[in-house]
Structures are given as C-alpha cells and as structure tokens.
Amino acid sequence: INSRQVSSPLRLLDSVMWADGGNGLVMMKTSRAKKLGLTNRVYPLSYAEISNYDCANQTPDITSTGHSIVGPKVLRDAKMKAKDVDMFHPYDDFLFAVMLKAEQCGFAKKGQGSQFLRDTDLGPKGTLPINTGGGQISCGQPGLAGGGINLVEAVRQLMGEGKGRQVP
C-alpha cells in the first residue's frame, strides 16, 4: 500500500515483478498415464488461449483483454456458467487484472468486478477461491512462462495436492 506510485493509481507492488524460474506440465493420453502407473489425473473439459497484442494502440477499450474472448468460450465449450466454477486462477500481472478478468469471464458484470471481489470470499475455503497459490503477484513472472504458475496451481488443486490451501 505504501510502495511508490508508478502510474496512477498503480503502485510498484501492484505489479508483478520479474523473477527467475519456470514451470511445466506434462500432458499425455490416459492409456500412457496408466501404463506409467500414474493414478492421479486431471481431465480438461475445455481449453482456449489468446495472446494479447499491443492493447494500448489496437483496442478501443483498454479494460478489455483476451479473457473477454476465451473466458466465455471455455465456459460455453464445457457447457458451464461462471456460477458452476469451483475456483478461478486468472493471469494476474497487475492487481486490477483479476478484477477485469472476473468481469470478462462472467463472475461479475462489467464495472462491478471490484464490488464482486470485496463481497466474495476468495480464500481456499471461500465461495470462489482465486489464485490459491498466491498467483504471480506473490512469486513473480519468469518471462513468458509467467501464466503457467496459475495453471500449475489449478492442477495441484484438482489433484488434491494443495496442502494447507487445498480447495474442498
């Protein structure tokens, strides 16, 4: 809260820091996992990704990110609505990004993300756990591998390996 202002209203500690590191996930067919003796598996219902381009110059609304495209798509493909989601692990390069992505993925109406986050228990045992491992804001962004930390945490949760922060 007391870190220096970088660009109003953002302060230095509202932004993700660069860090060394990496992360990875191994994906394979179920038959291969069984052959290897892997019993703890996760099966995705839907998948989508998007890379945001030069938003400042090419997007008329700077509060819109690629999540406004992929969020509704993955929910639609999985035949789900935001209210059906048990936890949310969005890319969090800035503190306000979680608010925008909550709106764009259908958890809150546009302009109501801040109130939604204030009114919702976001902890591991809460009504909508968000970035239960702390997200990038807590550990940094290792270059282009940054978004993977949230995916790794989501998979840990789904596999029941969240330890003290395990979502029920």
List where the protein language model places each region.
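Short glycine/threonine-rich loop-to-helix capping motif typified by GTGT followed
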Residues: D54-I62, D92-Q115, G123-G126, P142-A145
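Active-site nucleophile and cofactor-binding loops and adjacent substrate-binding regions
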Residues: S15-A19, H89-P90, G143-L144
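Conserved active-site "lid/cap" helical segment
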Residues: M17, G66-D86, A97, L158-E161
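Condensing-enzyme catalytic core mediating Claisen C-C bond formation in acyl metabolism
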Residues: N2-K73, D121-L128, T132-G133, I137, ...
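Hydrophobic alpha-helical bundle architecture
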Residues: A78-H89, Q112-Q115, N131-G140, M159-R165
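C-terminal amphipathic "assembly/sorting" segment characterized by alternating charged
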Residues: L144-P168
